[in-house]
């Protein structure tokens, strides 16, 4: 299973993985994602840590609480999903080459 793996390089590989993880965290945290619902009546901005940064609500929705709630939930969930999907994509691209275990 590990016939071609050089265990003497394990510390070096771990150090490289930690460095890449720190770079990944900084890069993803700086990204922003915008999701809209209700044809753009609600806009939600999230960062790469899935934290909501901004919410914009069109004044026409202020009289319709039920619609506002539904559209707001939808936009927030979409913004978080965009952030999570990007984290998965970026992690796969960044850490995909760390295999090296010969398995």
From Swiss-Prot:
GO terms for molecular function: DNA binding. It comes from the Bacteria. Pfam families: YbaB_DNA_bd. GO terms for cellular component: bacterial nucleoid; cytosol. The keyword DNA-binding applies. InterPro entries: YbaB-like_sf (IPR036894), YbaB/EbfC (IPR004401). It is found in: Cytoplasm, Nucleoid. SUPFAM superfamilies: YbaB-like (SSF82607). Keywords: Cytoplasm, DNA-binding. Binds to DNA and alters its conformation. May be involved in regulation of gene expression, nucleoid organization and DNA protection. Homodimer. PANTHER family: NUCLEOID-ASSOCIATED PROTEIN YBAB. Belongs to the YbaB/EbfC family. This is Nucleoid-associated protein CFF8240_0066. The lineage of its organism: Bacteria, Pseudomonadati, Campylobacterota, Epsilonproteobacteria, Campylobacterales.
């Amino acid at each position: 299973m590990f016939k071609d793996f050089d265990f003497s390089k394990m510390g070096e590989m771990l150090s490289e993985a930690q460095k890449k993880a720190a770079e990944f965290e900084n890069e993803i945290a700086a990204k922003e994602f915008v999701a809209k619902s209700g044809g753009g009546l609600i806009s939600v901005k999230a960062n790469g840590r899935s934290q909501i940064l901004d919410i914009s609500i069109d004044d026409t929705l202020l009289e319709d609480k039920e619609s506002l709630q539904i559209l707001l939930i939808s936009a927030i969930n979409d913004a978080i999903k965009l952030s999570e999907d990007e984290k998965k994509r970026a992690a796969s691209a960044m850490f995909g080459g760390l295999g090296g275990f010969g398995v």
